[in-house]
């Protein structure tokens, strides 16, 4: 009898017949603080042992420098890229020391301002909340193979004789279905939003999710799409610093979604202060350490009408 242990970053690439025969154990990605601790205890000491700077002493990285590498030079749930970047820093420093016959950094310590010299311009810019003054733009929370991310749902209207729904942004089938479902819900509850039903016959609706080169799918953007539609159709703007995640049903019920821990951290990184999610996700929040949710206000809802009440401002 042979026992196989396999690892994968993305289950979507595994053939279904093979996946059905596997026992799945999902391992959560590391938090930024956990990555910093792994770097401090393991990755940096490993490089220090391999590269001896002799009379110049032991090369060190400040915690702030390590965090900068994690945030702007890696995008992963693990620490593989982080290890490569730290290795690159040590090798580049060794080269500069050998060429110039002196340590290029004071007290053999690398600070945040030194990182760009060693690694070049940062390839990633961690998501930040984009305060907007436009109706129809809503911030959502997504979970990906590299951790939590924030995304923006944009809805615009254009005058037309024959109304149609256009979806762009490299959306998968499930996300497209969520958009259709959200629109149908709003149509059937137009009176509650003080909408003239004829608006659906005279205007084209365009829903877009930026960063079109990145594929997006899943049901968790349901309430975000519904709120974006409601905002655009009523011209009511969305509250500042609010994000949301949750699946929506045709009856307007908000269902729980996964990846809550990662989404919460993405929201906090982006400067979000208020998060809307399903009441059934309350238990997930209770399992997260208090330090990670400090400064965040959670709004737990059962139906999408509650989402509109929380997220949409009264003034136009």
Show which residues each predicted segment covers.
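AAA+/SF3 P-loop NTPase mechanochemical coupling elements
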Residues: 1-8, 57-62, 203
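Conserved catalytic-core segments of large NTP-driven translation/proteostasis enzymes
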Residues: 62-157, 161-171
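Conserved C-terminal "switch" segment of AAA+ ATPases
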Residues: 10-20, 24-87, 92-107, 192-198, ...
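Short, polar loop motifs at secondary-structure junctions
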Residues: 9-12, 280-282
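Conserved beta-strand scaffold positions in the cores of enzyme catalytic domains, especially
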Residues: 4, 24, 298-300
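Peripheral, non-AAA+ core regions of ATP-driven protein-machinery
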Residues: 107, 125-130, 134-139, 147-316
């Amino acid at each position: 009898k042979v026992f196989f242990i396999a690892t994968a970053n993305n289950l979507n690439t595994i053939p279904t017949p093979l996946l059905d025969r596997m026992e799945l154990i999902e391992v959560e990605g590391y938090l930024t603080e956990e990555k910093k601790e792994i770097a401090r205890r393991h990755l940096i000491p490993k490089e220090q042992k391999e590269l001896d700077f002799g009379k110049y002493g032991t090369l060190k990285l400040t915690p702030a420098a390590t965090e900068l590498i994690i945030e702007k030079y890696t995008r992963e749930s693990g620490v593989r890229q982080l290890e490569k970047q730290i290795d690159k820093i040590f090798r580049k420093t060794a080269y500069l020391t050998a060429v110039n016959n002196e340590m290029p950094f004071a007290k053999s310590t690398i600070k945040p301002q030194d990182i760009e010299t060693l690694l070049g311009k940062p390839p990633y810019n961690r998501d930040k909340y984009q305060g907007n003054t436009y109706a129809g733009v809503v911030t959502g929370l997504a979970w990906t193979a590299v951790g939590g991310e924030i995304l923006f749902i944009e809805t615009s209207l254009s005058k037309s004789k024959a109304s149609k729904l256009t979806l762009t942004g490299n959306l998968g089938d499930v996300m497209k279905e969520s958009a259709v479902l959200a629109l149908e819900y709003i149509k059937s509850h137009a009176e509650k939003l003080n909408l003239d039903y004829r608006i659906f016959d005279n205007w084209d609706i365009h829903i877009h999710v930026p960063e079109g080169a990145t594929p997006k799918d899943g049901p968790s953007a349901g309430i975000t799409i519904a709120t974006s539609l409601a905002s655009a159709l009523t011209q009511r703007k969305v509250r500042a610093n609010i994000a949301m995640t949750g699946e929506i049903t045709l009856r307007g019920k908000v269902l729980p979604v996964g990846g809550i821990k990662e989404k919460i951290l993405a929201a906090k990184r982006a400067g979000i202060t208020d998060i809307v999610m399903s009441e059934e996700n309350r238990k997930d929040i209770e399992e997260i350490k208090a330090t990670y949710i400090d400064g965040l206000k959670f709004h737990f809802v059962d139906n999408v009408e509650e989402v509109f009440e929380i997220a949409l401002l009264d003034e136009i």
